[in-house]
């Protein structure tokens, strides 16, 4: 069973610039994975429409982060997996996630061949790790966008498989493009 990803935190404002709550985020996903009280997906694949999980049109990360919505209450913010529209095994898709800083014009656009993105707004980060200037990161000062298979896939038969047969090669693709607009 293999489900590798990258857990980099992004803050397009730059180092020592505070929270990412005003960063507009857009995700090409009309579905997401509800979680239980231990942050594990329940197996349900739910619609984003009409919920704080709807990022099909760009909106500030902080707009709905404190909404009275059980999945956000469990983790004190975002920490869920979004299911990409039109995913097919082995098919690379461009422009799946876009993160912006409108003040600087910096834009991060991500593509992948993975079926989803786990998006975590550093809700429980409290003083570690240290940033590039040696200052501890604080809560919601970065957002991790992890292109990956769905968490707990081996235990959810309706999720895409993460099984890798012995002797087979594992490969996935994630592309980060940076622009200034």
Language-model segments: which ranges?
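An exposed, glycine/acidic-rich loop-and-rim segment of catalytic or binding clefts
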Residues: 1-181
């Amino acid at each position: 069973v293999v489900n590798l990803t990258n857990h980099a935190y992004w803050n397009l404002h730059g180092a020592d610039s505070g929270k990412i709550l005003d960063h507009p985020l857009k995700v090409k996903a009309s579905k997401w994975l509800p979680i239980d009280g231990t942050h594990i997906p329940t197996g349900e694949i739910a619609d984003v429409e009409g919920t704080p999980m709807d990022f099909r049109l760009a909106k500030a990360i902080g707009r709905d982060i404190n909404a009275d919505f059980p999945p956000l209450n469990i983790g004190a913010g975002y920490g869920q997996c979004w299911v990409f529209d039109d995913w097919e095994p082995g098919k690379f898709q461009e422009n799946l996630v876009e993160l912006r800083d409108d003040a600087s014009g910096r834009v991060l656009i991500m593509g992948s061949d993975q079926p989803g993105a786990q998006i975590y707004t550093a809700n429980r980060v409290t003083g570690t790790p240290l940033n590039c200037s040696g200052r501890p990161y604080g809560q919601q000062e970065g957002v991790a966008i992890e292109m990956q298979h769905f968490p707990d896939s081996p235990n959810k038969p309706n999720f895409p498989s993460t099984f890798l047969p012995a002797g087979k090669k594992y490969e996935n693709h994630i592309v980060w493009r940076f622009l200034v607009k």
